[in-house]
Amino acid sequence: MQKAIFLDRDGVLLNDAGQYYIYKTDDIIINNGVIDALKRFTDMGFLLIVISNQGGIAKQIYTKEDVEKIHSELKKQFEIEGINITEYYYCPHHSDVEKCLCRKPEPLLIEKALARFNIDPDKSFMIGDNKRDIEAAKKVGLSGIKIKPNQNLLDVLPHINA
């Protein structure tokens, strides 16, 4: 079985200060420490998987295509640095608009990744800046690491056991 680091997108990988929704490529600001931390996680043998709530789709603030453009640009920027994100999963729903099973704190997107990539939850972690990220992790047996929004991702390294 493989091990993985599951990462929330906005507030963990991307700086979301001053904006609740990030849906334009011009708004991409990678948080401090992200590049170095992702390289370290990769060197430790972890797959990197993004799990993100994108409720702005359900609220018709932006589209799935906007989210795909952000992920495509992120993929490009990370690949330049030699970083491979194994997969990007996102929930397009919002609880104010419709109920679903994939919006964190529900663990469906994490469960899909666990099954698809044969990941051992006991050796894997979820890093998020919101209580719901950690709740989703706990529901499937992952260790959850809560950081402050836009915190330097290198700060979590002492909490990751390879």
Report the location of each language-model feature.
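Asp-based, Mg2+/Mn2+-dependent phosphohydrolase catalytic module
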Residues: 5, 9, 65, 72-85, ...
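Active-site neighborhood of HAD-like aspartate-dependent phosphohydrolases
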Residues: 1-47
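Residue-identity detector for glycine
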Residues: 11, 18, 33, 45, ...
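Metal-dependent phosphoesterase signature
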Residues: 13-32, 57-66, 81, 93, ...
